[in-house]
Each structure stands twice: as C-alpha cells, then as structure tokens.
C-alpha cells in the first residue's frame, strides 16, 4: 500500500543495519546543535541510535542549553476542553472508540460549553484546546465552529476570557479547514498516532480514521486551507519509538519542503490506561522513562524553534524533568471527558498522571524558577506560521516572549492565585524582569505590570 511521503523501507533498513554512534561523533553533533540552528535529520537519526547513559546525559545537557537560550524559563499553560466523546472510529487504544460500552457518551450543548469555559476562565486559563471525537459526521465542522464561537463569547469579570482556541478534531477536506480558519482558531492539531502502516491498520480497524493516507495528509490540507499553525503528534507505545521519530522527521521535512514551514507544535503523549482498552493497559512497545527523555531532548535539538507539548498523561515528576529537556507547553488542571470541569463523569479518553489543580501546577513551576505563561500575543498580532519562524530563528521573537509571559502571569497572580502562589510568583517576576533584554522594553514591561495591578488587562507586546 502507498505510504505517501513516509519511506518505511528506508527507516526499517536504517534501524536494522546501523550501529550506535561513537563518542566523538556524538560530541561533534552536539557542538553543532549548540549553534541553535537545528541539526540535519541524518544527524538526528544518529543520536536516535544512542544508548550509552553517559553520552545521553550530554544530549540532555545540550537540550537544556538550547531550551534556555531560545525559550528562557517560560512554560506556556493551557487546558483541554472535551466537547464530545461520540466516535465512529474503533481505535483499539482509545476509550472513545465506538465499540466501547464501558463509558457514557455525551456531546455538550452550546450552553454546556459556555459553562465549562466559565469554569476554566474562573481558574485563570486563557488558552484552551478544543477536543472532540469523530462522531458527529457531516455536522462536525458546523458544531466545532459554534463551539469555538461559544468559547470566545464567554467573559467573566474582571478580566476573564479565553484568548486562543486551538482545536484537535478529525482529518477534514480543504474547504472545512478554510471554515475553521475563519472561525479564528489558533493551532490545528491532529496526531498521526503511529506512522507505521501495519500498526496503524491494526490499531484502526474501522471508521474514517482507518484511511492511513487521508489521515497522514491532513496537515497538507489544513495548510492549503490557510491554517498557518499546525500541530503534529505521536502516541508513543504503539510501535518502535525509533521508527516513529524518524517518520516524524520525514513528515516535518515534507511540510517544510512543500509549505516553507514545519509544524508549530509537536505533542509527545505516551499511551496510558483507558477504560475498556486492553492495548492501552498493555502497550505493545512501551517507552521507558529514559527513552522518553531521549525523544524529548532529541527533538528539541533537531527542531529547536518548534513548540513541544506534554499533557497531564505524565505524572508530576516526569513533567518536571521534561522542562529542562525541551518541553515548552503543558496542560494543567485537565479533564478528558465532556463536562468534566463541571462534574465528575465516567467518560474520560484516558487516565491522567497529574491530577493537580492549575494553581498547584503554577506554584510548582514557579518554585522551580520558571515563568508560567498564558501569552497569546503572537497569534493575535499575526506572528504565525512562516512569519513566526522568520522571527524565531534569528532570535528576535525573544523580545516579545518574556515580557508577555510576565504580564500574563501577573494577571493570574492578581486575580486568581492563592496567597502562597502569589508570594512565590511575585519573586519570580521580580527576578525574571531583569532578564528582559533591553532597557526600553523592560521599562514598558514594568509599566504594564503596574497597570495590571491598577485594573488593566490583556497588555502585550
């Protein structure tokens, strides 16, 4: 069967016939990586074969250096908003699959979506990822657009609102992506789950998602439809992680060659237990913690300007470790079932590893010296897609990122945080303010911070 731009034979031959790199080669690659321009995908494939624990530590140190140089100590926060768990697919690893009788099914009404949004806004969230199963057929896009409009319409005094809605829904035709673009979505996100054709077909026995090529080319159609920011992802544990990473790099290369820019984000979930799924309970290719850290670090080194996302599938310890390796966005206070923020419900897509509230996550992040960020400035000023990368790669985007992180964090501290989080958060802001790169921007940031204390909101560069 045609596998599109994923060259299975090349990947399988490489994995079968290639030895791990020597110390000298690893260090040469890492030295190149420290130039902050990424490394060739052939070089990344060499690091992928690395198993020596001592050399892996050097890879981790390099990834940490790159993360700090490009992103500083910022972590973007968001929450998923699940609006429907109806699904026509029968993905073996997912609790939403149509044959699963062990969960209750629900599609939120527009009023219920607004209520869920009000709860998220009242916690302090500014960014959400709208998620839906593939169960609404021809009406899915109409429903999604109404859901997006509902989220944006919610205002909770004194300054509560969602400022960026990203969306994760099934693969669509070009015309539908054009409609989503008009609805003011941020990033369109869709996971390939596995790039390995045999595994993909085994894991997706029926439903629209069973079409490997249609699913694989979704990002092409999204970008043809005018969506500048797209997010890709792999569900690690379904097949050999080395194959998956090499295929992901081929996908990125394809997008760069065709559209001039790769994905805006890469999501890195590991398969976790899901109600009614034996596969989820016993992954066929379980990825160890060390292997997972290698994946994160390798991708940060290879595509240094691409956002990398870790969800609450992972426990607090792994999430902490991942920050220094390259993760730049994390979800917080998540629920993975429709209506989950307003009531507990047995309809979740998968089990969570991190059950903490948003404030508890923020307190933890701030105590580590990171700045929690709710920034949406680039999206609203049109710094997206290729324009974003044109600013990011020369290092110019940093002029905006830290000040915007500080102002959005200040909004959270003033209006939503506990006293304990506010105390540590103010210290982080005071410290990080000194790292704003130029005096003029620093002065303007201080002005914005004071305006927020005085009642201002949504101040960004």
PLM regions and their residue ranges:
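Short, electropositive alpha-helical surface patch
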Residues: 141-152, 181-187, 241-259, 289, ...
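Core AdoMet radical
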Residues: 98-115, 119-223, 228-232, 236-238, ...
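Generic structural signal for well-ordered alpha-helices
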Residues: 79, 117, 145-152, 177, ...
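Acidic, glycine/proline-rich low-complexity segments that act as flexible tails and inter-domain linkers
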Residues: 10-20, 26-58, 66
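Conserved C-terminal portion of the radical SAM core fold
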Residues: 132, 187, 213-277, 285-317, ...
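Canonical Radical SAM [4Fe-4S] cluster-binding loop centered on the CxxxCxxC motif
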Residues: 71-112
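Radical SAM enzyme core and accessory elements
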Residues: 1-32, 320-325, 334-461
